Amino acid sequence: MPGVPRDSVLRLYDEGVHDFAAAADGLSAEGWDQLACGEWTATDLARHVLAVAGWYHDWLDRAERGDASPPFGAQELAAQNAEALRALSGLGGPEAMAQFVARARAYRDRLSAQWDVPYGYPRGTVTAGLHAAVAACEWHLHTWDLMHALGRGHRPSDAASLYAATGACSAAAESGLKGRVAAMLIPLGTHLRPWEAILRRSGRAPGPDD
């Protein structure tokens, strides 16, 4: 991954899992029912990240079998998310959180051996290592959601590396001129409030504590 060492990406991944679990520890019994991400409650959010971690295992299984095609299109993400939440509707927030941590850490343990394997995800075909940055970003963004539900902010320890690594994945997933231009702009973005840029790109509004 140009410019972002593997160890940095994995550290950000581990940090995202840890910080999400730590944020959940701050929730009261009633807090699990409060809105945390759009129409999703904190419980819904825990179920969502559990489902996403499961997808990552499934996609890596496909990659190991030699299938690097996208599992479904990006336009299907909303429907896939809704279906996954329905499937986990009987699982409480704390239980979903505990299962997420175990599943996410197990995925991380698989990554090192498969870092350069071609890997399909909804936005295209990259490598498992490039996609690891997207996974790290997913955990940090949803940590931000939980922390804001608690009235606090969240920022990853190395926002510039997270921005660069996720940008490298997005650029690799694009084809032709668009991908090349995106790759050229990454170094500039790392110096211009990278975490705020990630938040805004995901539809979130940075606060004073971010």
Each model region followed by its residue ranges:
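Helix-turn-helix
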Residues: 33, 39-42
